[in-house]
Amino acid sequence: MNTLLAKKKEPIDKLAAASAGGRSLGAEAFRRMLRSPVAITGGVITLLFLLLAIFAPLIAPKDPQIRYLQDQVELGKGIIPGPSPGFPLGVDDFGRDFLSRLIVGAQQTLLVGVLATVIGVLIGVIIGGLAGAFGGWVDTVLMRLVDVLLSFPSLLLAISIAALFAKPSQWTVILAVSIIGVPIFARLLRGSMLAQREADHVLAATSLGVKRGTIVFRHMLPNSLGPVIVQATLTLATAILEAAALSFLGLGDPDPTRAEWGLMLGNASRQFLDIRPELAYYPAIAIIVVALGFTLLGESLREALDPKNRR
């Protein structure tokens, strides 16, 4: 009897793999993205940003913390040394090389964006998975909580969460940005899980008496993560923008020695925008370009995986 049951269960796994698309679907999506100028543009921007962030300490021409020209800075007189052979973008109000700080700032920006996105995905997957797997009152309670979070504008919610902490830090920014991403991932996974409950391989497993936990973790959850992965790419762009906004508003890490694009933009805008406005433009442009890269890549990935676009 056990042997017969095991033989019946084998086609279930094959059916589940077929519904997920397997490697062929991933390869087809990858080929479609290679033919898309939008995907290539987003991929190139994202790759360059990742390389810059990973190897920032090696790429930066100077130490971003050393105050090379501090003796030449006179904010009261409106004097901040501009570009020179040794300092292509000039220096900031502490006399530190601005190009080096801009390069090293990519590392901090990536760290905040990735951590906020990962935390948001993990919490959202747990909430959405529980709601989709159990349904009933569990689904009702969790989704009402999600609705409460969705009722607030994302940036306003992030500001409110960050403002709750007496001492702002990098972790308060990560926590605030991650929380606003939770309801998005929770709803996405819940919807996918509900659709999977009616899939053929899940119904077959249920009829054969497979344990509920096995059905959820082996058949439903793996086949429901596709939309979450795509959304994570898009959310990373949003996380970078919102983290920069919090730092710009003074709700991030106030440490002046930390090189972070949002903090650099905020300091330049508040203290010496009329003296050296380009020092505000550089981090602003960097934030916009990186967010655009992740957005283009995420949208291209979504289109490539969309069943309606398969040929």
State each model region's role.
Residues 55, 107, 149, 153, ...:
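Residue-level hotspots within pore-lining transmembrane alpha-helices
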Residues 1-125, 129-130, 137, 155, ...:
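Gly/Trp-centered helix-boundary motif
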Residues 88, 92, 98, 119-126, ...:
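Generic hydrophobic transmembrane alpha-helix motif, especially the helices
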